[in-house]
UniProtKB/Swiss-Prot annotation:
Catalytic residues (UniProt): D93, D268
Assembly: Homodimer. Within each dimer, one monomer is responsible for RNA recognition and catalysis, while the other monomer binds to the replacement base PreQ1.
Cofactor(s) needed for function: Zn(2+)
GO molecular function: metal ion binding; tRNA-guanosine(34) queuine transglycosylase activity
EC number: 2.4.2.29
Pfam families for this protein: TGT
Residues holding substrate: D93, S94, G95, G96, F97, D147, Q191, G218
Protein name: Queuine tRNA-ribosyltransferase
Keywords: Glycosyltransferase, Metal-binding, Queuosine biosynthesis, Transferase, tRNA processing, Zinc
Keyword Metal-binding: yes
């Protein structure tokens, strides 16, 4: 992977990630949003439909794909790209977040994490080395190191111990990644909870090890938005300018805008797809909750500013009807729209940065959705 930074506007950055794959060279324009394909699919969508929304890179889930279908099936197909028939770039998380979310079902040691398989109950073990091996078999274009996602709230002492162990695991991840001869990209993950001095130590340690990009982890886990914004504003200027920056698991449209304001290049979140299945649709002036009875006789399109397949062909009344009847098509049309909305938002952000008017765009964005602009 090669990252090229083309332009900055304030702290906002406009760049390109270039990937050489067997099918040719692929580019990902940044800032970028990655739809989430947890089990090797963006729920309810074919790869072609996802691509039409504007997506250039997807996120796959190492933990879930390891448990089911497993490494052997993946190897038999070639890799995750072949398995799901998406031949553009894929980023996979390390499995750490899912393991640590198991709570009492897991035990953390220096070697890794022992936990109970949520599918069949057997005891299994995941380590930095094992995570690198799984992601190698997945053929991930961007591999994430194995780390501990520090919970919130956390005491300073706990956050410090967690961050220090994550650094040791980062080094082990790097070493196993290199031993495997993996020629793809490996990203480090900055931890340290809401403590700036711990974040600084994490950054210094990761830069010393050396990675192709840097993610900001341990945010969007329950902390106040002000803390997330503060940590991003503190962390991003200390990261290498020539490497992409990735805010993990974020988020709402406003979170994407605020992340870009503070120097983030990449995002992922299940929100557009999960919310779509629950009738919660993102539009230019805010949100449409399509299950509301007021849409029963609404013959207008979902969003007059949107040119997605759903908005070009169907009315709110039809989407309301599909949802009420429990029709699968309703969830699919909603998903097409929400994914398109996110990709259109990122395209608007990129254009605003190119034209040196990103802050004007931010003001207009918040004005449309009826909210005030957060302070930096």
């Amino acid at each position: 992977m090669k990252f090229t930074l083309h332009k900055t506007n304030g702290m906002a950055r406009r760049g390109t990630m270039t990937f050489n794959r067997p099918q040719g060279e692929f580019t990902v324009e940044t800032p970028a949003f990655m739809p989430v394909g947890t089990y090797g699919t963006v729920k309810g969508m074919t790869p072609e439909e996802v691509r039409v929304t504007g997506a250039e890179i997807l996120l796959g889930n190492t933990f879930h794909l390891w448990l089911r279908p497993g490494q052997e099936i993946m190897r038999q197909h070639g890799d995750l790209h072949d398995f799901m028939q998406w031949h553009r770039p894929i980023l996979t998380d390390s499995g750490g977040f899912q393991v640590f979310s198991l709570g009492k079902l897991r035990k953390i040691t220096e070697e890794g994490v022992k936990f109970q398989n949520p599918i069949n109950g057997e005891r299994i073990f995941l380590s930095p080395e094992k995570s690198m091996e799984i992601q190698y078999d997945l053929g991930s274009d961007i591999v994430m190191i194995f780390d501990e996602c520090t919970p919130y709230p956390a005491t300073f002492d706990y956050a410090k111990k967690s961050m220090e162990m994550s650094l040791r695991w980062a080094k082990r991840s790097r070493e196993r990644f290199d031993e495997l001869g993996n020629k793809n990209a490996l990203f480090g993950i900055v931890q340290g909870s809401t403590f700036e001095d711990l974040r600084k130590l994490s950054i210094e340690g990761l830069i010393n090890i050396g990675f192709d990009g840097y993610a900001v982890g341990g945010l969007a886990v329950g902390e106040p938005k002000e803390d997330m914004h503060r940590i991003l504003a503190y962390v991003c200027p200390q990261l290498p300018a020539d490497k992409p920056r990735y805010l993990m698991g974020v988020g709402k449209p406003e979170d994407l805008v605020e992340g870009v304001r503070r120097g983030i290049d990449m995002f992922d979140c299940v929100m557009p797809t999960r919310n779509a299945r629950n009738g919660h649709l993102f539009v230019s002036n805010g949100i449409v909750k399509i299950r509301n009875a007021k849409y029963r006789n609404d013959t207008t399109s979902l969003d007059p500013e949107c040119d997605c397949y759903t908005c070009k062909h169907y009315t709110k009344a039809y989407l309301y009807h599909l949802d009420k009847c429990g029709e699968i098509l309703g969830a699919r049309l909603n998903t097409i729209h929400n994914l398109h909305y996110y990709q259109r938002l990122m395209a608007q952000i990129r254009q605003a940065i190119e034209e040196d008017r990103f802050e004007d765009f931010v003001v207009e964005f918040y004005k449309k959705i009826g909210k005030s602009v957060p302070t930096r």
